[in-house]
């Protein structure tokens, strides 16, 4: 991955300015989810998308199909502010401050433990009264989790939380469940059907936190990520329309192009186990795919930088999607 990719991504960030598909229904294999012209691609007699209401029907069906696999996004109507504490504070050059924070994403009750996420938050001591755009920065599959985008290890060209902060943004780099400081037992937390939905929930609480900060313009929020962080950006941005710009560095391809259609890599507890248990790792049965998800981000901005020799996320599937 070359540094210029994130330079372009930064330029993009500066702009911050279907009925459910059942397994017994007929489908055209990999073509169904790539067809964005129809209100319902399985039943084209319903007609093509002619207006915004038609597209909303299609987007609603995409979300329903996504939640069949990931589990439903819990109700967020009575959450209240995010409680957090500062664990460490480190001054950096040019008036930048790196704070290691911890915040509650799930309150405990008689049936489950409270869950807390640690993250690195970059803010500015100079012109501290200015409300700045903010970016949620999601890490790749790496043991140190949030430490890589924060510039504390890993690949130098993936220190995007630090780099974007140096360019004037407020940035937040949280741990994905089971990475970094976020020890997490997926099987012991049965309220989540997938690690993907748990991560989406945590990320949305991160957006809540950012919007409440006096240093942040709550109407200018973006999200960026590499690999795991790339598709995590897409998933989170699909559910959270407060994210106005989504930037991915690899992280997706058509399911039929992922290891020639072998979806085992998507099925661990960290991701979507139902792809294996309910859909036999068969991309022709999984009721959603990335062309729909990325289309569902419209009219918000989306940028991707995808390598042409990626073994995981095969580039022709990216081209099919875009």
Can you say where each PLM-predicted feature lies in the sequence?
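Mobile cap/lid helix-loop segments that gate and shape the active-site cleft of serine hydrolases
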Residues: 245-293, 314-322
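N-terminal pre-domain segments of enzymes
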Residues: 22-74
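Conserved strand-to-loop "acid loop" that flanks and positions the catalytic carboxylate
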Residues: 298-300, 304-313
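Cap/lid segment of the alpha/beta-hydrolase catalytic domain
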Residues: 128-215, 219, 239, 259-264
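Short beta-strand immediately N-terminal to the catalytic nucleophile in serine-hydrolase-like folds
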Residues: 223-225, 249
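Gly/Ala-rich beta-loop-alpha elbow adjacent to hydrolase catalytic centers
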Residues: 225-229, 233
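N-terminal cap/lid segment of alpha/beta-hydrolase-fold proteins
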Residues: 60, 68, 73-130
């Amino acid at each position: 991955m070359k540094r210029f990719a994130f330079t372009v991504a930064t330029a993009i960030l500066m702009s911050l300015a279907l009925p459910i598909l059942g397994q017994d229904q007929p489908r055209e294999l990999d073509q169904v989810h790539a067809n964005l012209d129809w209100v319902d691609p399985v039943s084209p007699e319903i007609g093509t998308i002619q207006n915004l209401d038609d597209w909303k029907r299609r987007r609603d069906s995409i979300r329903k199909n996504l939640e069949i696999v990931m589990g439903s996004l819990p109700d967020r109507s009575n959450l209240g502010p995010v409680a957090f504490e500062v664990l460490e504070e480190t001054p950096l050059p040019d008036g930048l401050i790196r704070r290691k924070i911890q915040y509650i994403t799930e309150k405990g009750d008689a049936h489950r433990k409270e869950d807390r996420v640690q993250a690195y938050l970059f803010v500015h001591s100079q012109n501290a009264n200015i409300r700045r755009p903010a970016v949620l920065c999601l890490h790749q599959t790496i043991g140190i989790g949030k430490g890589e985008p924060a510039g504390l290890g890993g690949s130098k060209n993936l220190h995007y939380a630090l780099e974007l902060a140096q360019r004037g943004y407020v940035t937040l780099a949280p741990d994905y469940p089971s990475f970094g400081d976020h020890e997490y037992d997926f099987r012991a937390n049965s309220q989540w059907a997938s690690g993907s939905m748990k991560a989406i929930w945590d990320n949305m609480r991160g957006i809540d936190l950012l919007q409440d900060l006096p240093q942040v313009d709550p109407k200018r929020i973006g999200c960026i990520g590499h690999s795991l962080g790339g598709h995590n950006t897409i998933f989170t941005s699909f559910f959270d329309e407060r994210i106005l710009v989504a930037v991915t560095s690899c992280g997706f391809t058509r399911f039929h192009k992922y290891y020639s259609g072998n979806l085992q890599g998507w099925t661990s507890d960290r991701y979507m186990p139902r792809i294996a248990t309910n859909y036999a790792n068969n991309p022709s049965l999984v009721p959603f795919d990335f062309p729909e998800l990325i289309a569902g981000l419209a009219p918000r901005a989306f940028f991707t930088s995808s390598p042409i020799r990626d073994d995981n996320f095969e580039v022709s599937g990216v081209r099919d999607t875009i």
